[in-house]
C-alpha cells in the first residue's frame, strides 16, 4: 500500500466513525508514525509502506476510530510552541488556553521587582506553568493540583522543557495545597467549568478520555469560580492580578460572582472567535 492509498483508506474509515476532519486526522497520524512533517507526505505519495508501518498505522487508525484523541495516540501536543506529553490523567492542553498563558507572561513582564512569583491553580499537564516559566526567565512558578497523577505528568513536562528547577509542584484540594502566607504576583487558572450534567453530551474524545476531575465544575459549572472568588484574596499581592479561563456563555455569571466578593473586574477578554473566555481581576 502506498502513502496516498493509506491516507485515502484511513480517511474513509475515520469518516464512517464520525471523526471530524478524517483526512487531516489520517495524515497527522501517518506523518507522526513516519516521523515527517505532514506536508512531506505530499512529496511521498508513491512511497510504499512497509508491513510494520502498515500494521502500526492500522492500530492507530483503529484507536482513533474508537474516538481516542489524536494527542493520546501520538502521546503529545504542542502548547505555545512547547512540547507537552499527554495522557489520561490530565486534560489535553487546548489552543484557546494559550491566550491565558500569554496574558499571564505579558503581565509578569511588566513587574519591576524580580523574581516575580506566579501560581498556576489547577495545573493539570502543567502547560500554563511551563509556558509562563519559559517566557519569564526570572519568574518562579508554583503549580498546584488535586491529582497526583496529573502532577506527575506536569513534572515530566517541566523536566522535558528544562524548567523543572523554577516550578514547584504542590498537591492538595484547592488552596489547601498552599502554605499559609504564600503570596503571588499572578494567579492564573483554567479550572474545571463544565456543568456536571453536560459532560455526558460532550464528544467522546472529551467525555471518555479527559479526566472527569478536569471537566466537572459542579451543577452549574461555576463551583471553582465561587471557590476562587471566596478564597484567593489572601494569596494575591496587593498589586497582583488574577486571570481565569471560563466556558463560553459563563461571563456574566462569573463577573457577578467576583463583584459580589468585592473583586475589581478589570477586563473580560475574548478569544479569537470573539467569545468572552478570560476574566482579569484584582483586589
Ligand atoms: C480544566 S483542567 C486544566 C488543566 C490545565 N491547567 C490546562 O489548562 O490544560 C483542571 C484541573 O483542575 C484539577 N482539579 C480538579 N479539582 C481540583 C481541586 N479541588 N483542587 C485542585 N485542583 C483540582 C484537575 O485535576 C485538572 O487537572
Predicted regions: what they are:
Residues 14, 108, 158, 232, ...:
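Conserved hydrophobic residues forming the short capping helix/wall of the S-adenosyl-L-methionine
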Residues 30-107:
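Conserved AdoMet
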Residues 95-201:
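Conserved SAM/SAH cofactor-binding pocket of Class I
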Residues 29, 67, 97, 128, ...:
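Residue-level signal for inorganic ion chemistry
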Residues 1-42, 46-49:
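Non-catalytic accessory regions of SAM-dependent methyltransferases
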Residues 219-281:
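Conserved Class I SAM-dependent methyltransferase catalytic core
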Residues 193-223:
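Mobile active-site "lid"/loop adjacent to the S-adenosyl-L-methionine
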